[in-house]
C-alpha cells in the first residue's frame, strides 16, 4: 500500500447531542483539524482508504462508523465506555481547573495543572489505543486526538 492510504480524510461527531461551551467547541475543532492533517488509521482487514469516521454515543456505548472517502461501508466498531469513565471524569475535573487557572492563576500553577491534564489525557489515549487494538491500528498521536473527541462527546452529552 502507498503511504497515506491508511488515514482519515474526514471526522464527524454526532450532531444530535448539540453544542457545548466555547472552550469545548474549540477543543473539538482543533482536534479534528489536527487529526485530519496528520493521522494513522488502519481498519484491520481493509485494503486502504482514505476513510471517513463518524463518532457517536449510542446506548452509552462509543460507536466508530467507518466508510471510505466515497462513502462505501468499511466497518462499525462499538466500544464499551466503562474503561473510560474514571479517566474522562478525572479529565473533566482537571480541565475545569485548567480553564479557571488560565483566567486567574500564576504561570507556574497553570503549568502544574497542564502537566496533570496531559498525563490524564495520555492515559485515556493509551486506553483508547488498547481498546481499538485488533480492530483499528492507530498511532499514539491519532489516539490522543480521538480521545479528545470522545471527551467532547461526553461534554456535550
Curated annotation (Swiss-Prot):
InterPro entries: UCP032146. It comes from the Bacteria. Belongs to the UPF0262 family. This is UPF0262 protein RL0614. It comes from Rhizobium johnstonii (strain DSM 114642 / LMG 32736 / 3841). The lineage of its organism: Bacteria, Pseudomonadati, Pseudomonadota, Alphaproteobacteria, Hyphomicrobiales.
Amino acid at each position: 500500500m502507498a503511504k497515506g492510504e491508511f488515514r482519515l480524510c474526514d471526522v464527524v461527531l454526532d450532531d444530535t447531542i448539540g453544542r457545548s461551551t466555547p472552550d469545548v467547541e474549540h477543543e473539538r475543532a482543533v482536534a479534528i483539524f489536527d487529526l485530519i492533517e496528520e493521522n494513522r488509521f488502519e481498519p484491520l482487514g481493509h485494503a486502504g482508504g482514505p476513510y471517513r469516521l463518524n463518532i457517536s454515543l449510542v446506548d452509552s456505548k462509543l460507536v466508530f462508523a467507518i466508510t471510505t472517502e466515497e462513502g462505501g461501508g468499511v466497518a462499525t466498531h462499538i466500544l464499551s465506555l466503562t474503561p473510560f469513565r474514571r479517566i474522562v471524569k478525572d479529565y473533566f475535573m482537571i480541565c475545569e481547573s485548567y480553564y479557571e487557572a488560565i483566567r486567574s492563576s500564576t504561570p507556574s500553577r497553570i503549568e502544574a495543572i497542564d502537566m496533570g491534564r496531559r498525563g490524564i489525557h495520555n492515559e485515556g489515549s493509551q486506553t483508547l489505543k488498547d481498546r481499538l487494538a485488533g480492530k483499528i491500528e492507530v498511532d499514539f498521536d491519532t489516539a490522543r486526538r480521538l480521545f479528545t473527541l470522545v471527551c467532547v462527546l461526553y461534554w456535550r452529552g
